[in-house]
Amino acid sequence: MRQSSIYETEPMGDLKGAFLNGVIEVETELPAEVLMRRMLALERIMGRKRVKGRKQARGKYRPRIIDLDLLFFNKETIDTRILKVPHPRLHERRFVLAPMSELAPALIHPKLNASISEMLAGLKSPFRVTLARADLLRPQPSKREASTR
C-alpha cells in the first residue's frame, strides 16, 4: 500500500470548514464491485449516512464524515449502477489530482488519454488545495475526553 500526503481543500458551496483529502494505492484480489461494497460498508461503520442523490435541496453539497471513492481499478473501465471507473469527475477535481499526482503522475486516464500530471496542469478549478497543516492531522479529543480535562 502507498499513500499520498494529506491535502486541505476549501469547502464547496456554502459548507464551512476545511476538507481533508488523500489517495491510497492498494493491491487486491477482490473484484472492483466487491471492493466498492466494502468501502461503502466502511463509510457506514464510520457514521456516514448517504442520501438519495448527490446534492441536498437547493443544489448544495452535504457535509460528511468520510467519503471513499474508487478512482481507478487497474486499467479497467467499469460502468455499473454502483460503480463508475475511472471516477467520472476525477479530472475536474484538484483535491483528487494533487494527491494522486504524488503516487502516479504518469498514469493515463483510459477515456481522456491524458496523464494525471497533465490533467492537474490543465485544471481550471477555482478551489485551492494545499498540504494540510499538522494541527489538522492530529487526532482531536472526543467531547467526553475534552469535558474531563
Predicted regions and their residues:
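A short beta-strand-loop structural module common to alpha/beta enzyme folds
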Residues: 1-8
